Amino acid sequence: MALIRLVAPERVFSDLASMVAYPNFQVQDKITLLGSAGGDFTFTTTASVVDNGTVFAVPGGYLLRKFVGPAYSSWFSNWAGIVTFMSAPNRHLVVDTVLQATSVLNIKSNSTLEFTDTGRILPDAAVARQVLNIIGSAPSVFVPLAADAAAGSKVITVAAGALSAVKGTYLYLRSNKLCDGGPNTYGVKISQIRKVVGVSTSGGVTSIRLDKALHYNYYLSDAAEVGIPTMVENVTLVSPYINEFGYDDLNRFFTIGISANFAADLHIQDGVIIGNKRPGASDIEGRSAIKFNNCVDSTVKGTCFYNIGWYGVEVLGCSEDTEVHDIHAMDVRHAISLNWQSTADGDKWGEPIEFLGVNCEAYNTTQAGFDTHDIGKRVKFVRCVSYDSADDGFQARTNGVEYLNCRAYRAAMDGFASNTGVAFPIYRECLAYDNVRSGFNCSYGGGYVYDCEAHGSQNGVRINGGRVKGGRYTRNSSSHIFVTKDVAETAQTSLEIDGVSMRYDGTGRAVYFHGTMGIDPTLVSMSNNDMTGHGLFWALLSGYTVQPTPPRMSRNLLDDTGIRGVATLVAGEATVNARVRGNFGSVANSFKWVSEVKLTRLTFPSSAGALAVTSVAQNQDVPTPNPDLNSFVIRSSNAADVSQVAWEVYL
């Protein structure tokens, strides 16, 4: 008999089947189940939700497991029981076994799901579906605002009694105004989630104070309205492990590994999520490892993604204050993708705001390593790295994306790229190495490139406006800086190139001006750049039918020798051999230019006159001109001048 000891009211069982079949439990009984799934139980006749892990149905009533702290998956006899257990809020489950999902696992507020080294969840083998859901819902009822609410405001108003908002309530605001974060809204309208910190009513109007300022103007003319969503709050996933490596098992499809919608304070750390895509294959069924839609205050840390059909982390809707740290994504479409909310029909709402990616790595992505899809505001990547992407390393398709100390290696296109109409991404101290087309591509709408490096590409920087300041560029086969427009309709804006190292290393020109795309060199200024070694051939021009006016230039270097010295005037004149250079022809695809010679008088005799440079001459020796035999003349307005004069040669 399975009942091995009976000393009333103590009942001890060696197996679960015998315990749940026992017919004579009493409320006062002390009940113990032995074994790895064992524990102490109490008997009750009060109706309880059966999950076959913490609550069992037995003859005449229910057995309730006595425990403090988390429940363990090893307690449960099937997946359905775990789903039942987690269907209520305030749950804590430790997954310490391999679980075969047969449905979606929904996680409610104030819950924690953590995995041991042996715990994992295998996706449903019968139906491709989501694995873990943290899902709230949009408001079912909206009310109009009572007055306009301007961007920056932390107060909205509604008619008194129209909205049952109290302190701690979440609100969902929206209007018909289109999002403005990027150049292509795709019809997505503005929306935001805010939390109520105070409510007051006066004169038929309720004023609601919000926890954060609004990012947009919510005007009555745009049908601005507000409702109360159902939010899932305060969920933590520790070391979630979804799927196993097994490329021959094509039944382990899932659409989304972890899906969150209308959630707040969701934190995922140290996970592993494995897709079902064969290594290197193009996209297949299965969208994202983690998806945040209309979520606020979310984090992902230290999580790895492998062979995902689409995205490692996807952020869309009005998700706000999302941080992703220390992820590793291998063979996915994008490691991180900021996206627009898409529906088959009907309205679309919200763009990601305040996104931060830190120390994230993407390997062998099938498209860009990191992408921002057309909308989004205040997006920043710090110390992120893309290796061997099949497209760009980083792609900015929304305005003003900022990259700090990021790196792109061996991208099939650009190391860092923007897209049509995207205005002024910001790159600071970033490195692009051996990318096929360019290190940094800002030719769709301008950009700012500060103290960056690009090595081993066709072009170091492609740009049509903005600023390239500081940094170092080597081994770029065509040019270090290519002034062009990748789309003819894009307007060229002023471009400053300042303090950049573009020394000649046997390949390419320093700067390439693309007349074919209508580039006007007079909108470019160049100062303090080191173009040592390029000599006469520092610039490349193409597509001009008449000779263009050169850019504004000051204190640029073409050589590192023969560019400084001291001359003593004799009878008001001195001829100086120096590496002065110039192009004096009128060929269309060339600039007419001459070196700038700065003169500084060192002595001041009574015969001193005004100084000027005349007669710049270039050596014409055949077959190889000698630049050290180039010369210029310093001439004083006083033929008796015997001053000593320091000279410096610049472009």
Task: Give each language-model segment a name.
Residues 83-86, 100-114, 121-154, 158-163, ...:
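Extracellular beta-strand-rich solenoid/capping regions of secreted or surface-exposed proteins
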Residues 559-651:
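Extracellular attachment/recognition segments
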Residues 102-104, 122-127, 246-256, 277-289, ...:
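Short glycine/acidic-rich loop motifs that flank beta-strands on beta-rich extracellular proteins
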Residues 7-25, 121-216, 573-575:
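Autoprocessing Asn-cyclization modules and mimics
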Residues 113-116, 165, 232, 236-239, ...:
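All-beta strand scaffolds that present successive hydrophobic residues in beta-strands
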Residues 164-182, 215-241, 583-603, 642-651:
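Extended Gly/Ser/Thr-rich low-complexity repeat segments
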